[in-house]
Amino acid sequence: VDSIEEVLKKCGIRDGMTLSFHHHFREGDYVVNMVMEAIHKMGIKDLTICASSLGKAQNPIVPMIEDGTITNIQSSGVRGKIGEAISNGKLKGLAIMRGHGGRVRAIETGETHIDIAFIGAPSADDMGNCRAIGSQNGADCGVLGYAAVDAQYADKVVVVTDTLVPFPNVPASIDMTNVDYVVKVDAIGDPT
């Protein structure tokens, strides 16, 4: 798929969905902001963000909390301006904090249902086999294990990468049987 906007349409993005993201790029992450900016431009509202963690890198989504694009957050922690916005009552719905194991349990039991999972991957082939290493831009992250449960249980799984490699990209951290779409972007994160 050629763009975030195109993959959102293919996944049937609509109001009220739950979207998942991961924090393996820590404060260098570009994926959350990139996806949420595209969604915001489409006018989609009332979303639940189920992220393994949210930090200062995601501060640009605060206006989306304030305008109702994002109404619920599930995470292991929130820092920076997102934490301040939640503490100041700007989130219209619930903020649910769980440890990483609690997040996995909630997804496996169906307590949390993910409509679309976005997995930032340093490298992927066009079939979706992705790895935590191999980024042309140096944005390797070590592991994609946090995202495995999302890939297994989400209705749609989108791998976002800045490095497409020849098939097969093995050994894959997440294999193509659990991926619906691959989107190549200019950069998934800042390795510094």
Regions found by a protein language model. Give the residues of each.
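Conserved alpha/beta enzyme-core scaffold
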Residues: 1-192
